[in-house]
Regions:
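Non-catalytic, topology-defining segments of multipass membrane proteins
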Residues: 1-182, 208, 218-247
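Glycine/small-residue-rich hydrophobic helix-like segments
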Residues: 185-229
Length: 247
């Protein structure tokens, strides 16, 4: 089965799992679980997606310990964006070819559908974009068994209770999928990379996208006083806990 087909099935599953969980909680007066799930989903998206797979694994914008690194790697994997080497490699390629015909999700050269579901593609990338990832045993393992691991995790959660896949992973998956596809890859690149307060609020700092493209080696997109970057603040908090101080 093709990579894109597997990813479509995975995302389709997360849609169904989330819808079922919300319906079950609604008819059984368990909406408090949904509220807790939303809080978990926010942390899940920030730590695994924006701080982890994006700013740490893709851009190496900060250093952390092995435990935090492992947590970020696996939380990011559970979101269902795709295999780590593929996703990270595509994003590095995007930065190298931003807003050109080679950019895999440029709104100038791609349709809405191609941008939203751009991660269905598994292009062959030059080793210069992924060589460091291929040296990492944990990432190689996750790359090789990605879909089997997610199937196992979701089946286990289903056996415990049918609402768990949707509450624990579905909400976070759908949020990062649509926020990345619609806001960051599309709206934040209309007319080139741009900054937008609303997008930044909705994506916990990722919406200061022009700042990010100016210098992706920095873990925070906060340049002007009002450009609050929640993800950057959380990274800073982690770094302070580990090192005692951080610039």
């Amino acid at each position: 089965m093709l990579y894109g087909t597997k990813l479509r099935l995975l995302w389709g599953w997360y849609h169904l799992a989330t819808a079922y969980s919300l319906y079950y909680c609604y008819i059984n007066d368990l909406m408090s679980l949904v509220y807790y799930s939303l809080i978990w989903g926010v942390l899940f998206v920030i730590v695994g997606g924006y701080a982890g797979w994006h700013r740490y694994f893709t851009h190496k914008s900060f250093k952390t310990d092995k435990i935090t690194r492992t947590i970020m790697l696996w939380l990011g994997a559970a979101m269902g964006l795709g295999k780590p080497v593929t996703v990270v490699g595509i994003h590095r390629y995007h930065h190298a070819n931003s807003d050109t015909e080679q950019d895999i999700h440029s709104p100038k050269y791609s349709t809405w559908w191609e941008i939203l579901f751009g991660y269905y593609k598994e292009p062959k990338l030059s080793k210069k974009y992924i060589s460091d990832l291929l040296k990492d045993k944990q990432i190689r393992f996750l790359q090789k068994y990605y879909f089997k691991i997610l199937i196992l995790i979701n089946l286990t959660l289903l056996l415990i209770h049918p609402i768990l896949p949707g509450l624990l992973f579905g909400i976070g998956n759908l949020y990062v999928m649509y926020s990345t596809g619609i806001i960051i890859n599309n709206l934040n690149h209309r007319g080139g990379s741009n900054n937008n307060l609303l997008y930044a609020i909705l994506t916990f700092g990722e919406g200061w996208h022009d700042n990010h493209h100016l210098d992706s080696s920095k873990y925070s997109n906060w340049i002007k006083w009002y450009q609050i970057d929640i993800t950057g603040l959380i990274i800073k908090w982690f770094l302070k806990r580990e090192h005692g101080s951080v610039s």
